Amino acid sequence: ASSLVASAKADSKSVGAPLQGDAQPAKDVTRSLARYVVSARTEDLPENVRKEATRTMLNWVGCAVGGSGHETVDNAMGALAPFSGPAQASVLGRSERMDVLHAALMNGISSHVFDFDDTHLKTVIHPAGPVASAILALAEYQPVSGRDFLNALVLGIEAECRIGNAVYPTHYDMGWHITGTAGVFGAAAATGRLLGLTEQQMLWAFGLAATQPVGLKVMFGTMTKPFHPGRAAQSGFTAALLASHDYTSSEEVLEASNGWANVLSRDPDYSEITEGLGETYEVLLNAYKPFACGIVIHPAIDGCIQLRNEHELTADQIEGIELQVHPLVLQLTGKKTPQ
């Protein structure tokens, strides 16, 4: 039942191994990614990547509008709207407008509240939430062409998913909700690109993003889970804005011995971040849910539908159901009293 997740890294790396022999710490990982994000040309985006990014965006809009009336969003709006700044950007599906940073937060919350959003199968990151929430808010504040918007979406997804690839599965196994912790980099990359950051400023934006990780898997089953992509969108956007005004940070935040990857995971694989930049695209690994729940339980739902159809079963004919699943299914979705 958890084959989609288990396939992420069948060739698991050794966990917690120190540098051995002639092994050297990685160098210029953060700079390489920053250089790529600021220099990648919109016109070089392959057509299949452009189409997948469009599908990702449309799927995200549907999720955000669909979740906009949920109690979670109502509560968040009630708490934070009185403290919002100028009415600069939309909260999709609602009449209220907020300042760009609060709008990014709210759209991130609403797009994830039903757990119906896109999934990067290699890492189980939900890529669009942090990135699209941030760049939509920015695009309402300053003019952005459709081509540049789509390119920024692709670059943001590339950044967050490549960074996620480098630390999965140990980062996730340690209890971090990777959509938030990696998503903040995607939001910083995408908004930074639209703000026209230099390579140096993008380096700083990544550093500022890295120092704001959110959230914890213990929050699954509560209103705080969708807060994670919302806060990632808001924090990544904030990082890019600060960097645009030369607010400095570490220039090696991904690869430093006390940097993001080494603190939040074990044995990170930095080649996942840098190899194939501009040649392979993580958005092509995106998937879209037929059911509004964690993907690990989808096979069980499919099985129930198949049995019902094959045997023409009705609910009153079923006394009980016994499922054999991977322990991860219970860990992620076995919430008997969701809040």
Where are these regions (language model features)?
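N-terminal core-entry segment
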Residues: 3-284, 327-329
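Short, surface-exposed alpha-helical recognition segments that flank or form part
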Residues: 125-126, 291, 295
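A short glycine-threonine-serine/GTX helix/turn-capping micro-motif
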Residues: 284-292
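Intrinsically disordered, low-complexity Ser/Thr/Pro/Gly-rich interaction regions
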Residues: 294-339
